[in-house]
Design a protein with these regions (language model features):
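N-terminal secretory signal peptides
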Residues: 1-13, 21-27
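A short acidic-Thr-Gly-centered motif at the start of a beta-strand
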Residues: 40-42, 150-153
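Generic beta-sheet signal
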Residues: 46-48, 157-163
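All-alpha RGS (Regulator of G-protein Signaling) helical domain and cognate RGS-like helical scaffolds
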Residues: 93, 126-141, 145-151
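Glycine-rich phosphate-binding loop signature in dinucleotide/nucleotide-binding domains
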Residues: 96, 151-156
């Protein structure tokens, strides 16, 4: 399912951004530790890297927004675009290739996924639950849990999802920053486990 994007046409090579320099030493050291843990889990497989979309100014979409029209939605800032490219660069530098890249239908999620990995597969279950009937949100959450359980049973393979803070909060019972990824897996009882976090500097 193709969804509109707010991104201008862009050569593929522009997505291969390298990680920014000039970070504080303490931040680098902390990031390196989580980096190593997440990489090992992704390489082993049986997990999902679920990212909150990259930086997009504002809190909620404007009244009357439409999914098919990016101009009516919150969109990525320039910093957010750089952040999304850095996510892709991190995976590319480590030769980590997701088996599947899925995205919420919202433009800021589609754009985050596109800048990082190329055009994603759009999945309604990853969409924001705000403004939707409670029954719809509950059904989507069941879909996500089922998909995570399936992904967790496939060693040597991982998926990447791009979604929203509220979705990740409902699914994993934790908060996330813009552009942050949670490495998730389901245990044998189907419970969702956060086994690592990944915050990649822009």
């Amino acid at each position: 399912m193709a969804m509109p994007s707010s991104l201008p046409p862009e050569p593929r090579i522009a997505r291969r951004a390298v990680l920014g320099a000039g970070l504080a030493f303490a931040s680098l050291r902390s990031w390196a530790a989580q980096d190593t843990g997440a990489e090992a889990l992704l390489r082993k497989g049986g997990v999902v890297a679920a990212f909150r979309h990259a930086l997009a100014p504002g809190t909620f979409d404007p009244p009357g927004f439409r999914l098919g029209d990016c101009s009516t939605q919150r969109n990525l800032s320039e910093e957010g675009r750089a952040q999304a490219r850095s996510v892709g660069a991190w995976f590319q530098q480590r030769q980590l290739q997701p088996g599947k890249v899925l995205s919420s239908p919202w433009c800021r999620c589609v754009d985050s996924a596109t800048l990082a990995f190329g055009t994603p597969q759009v999945w309604a279950a990853l969409g924001s639950p705000r403004g939707s009937p409670e029954t719809t949100g509950a059904a989507h959450l069941r879909e996500l849990r089922t998909a995570l359980a399936t992904a967790s049973s496939q060693p040597g393979r991982f998926e990447v999802w791009f979604t929203h803070m509220f979705v990740l909060s409902d699914l994993a019972n934790t908060n996330t920053s813009s552009g942050e990824g949670l490495i998730l897996r389901a245990d044998r009882s189907g419970n969702v486990e956060v086994v690592a976090r990944l915050s990649i500097p822009a």
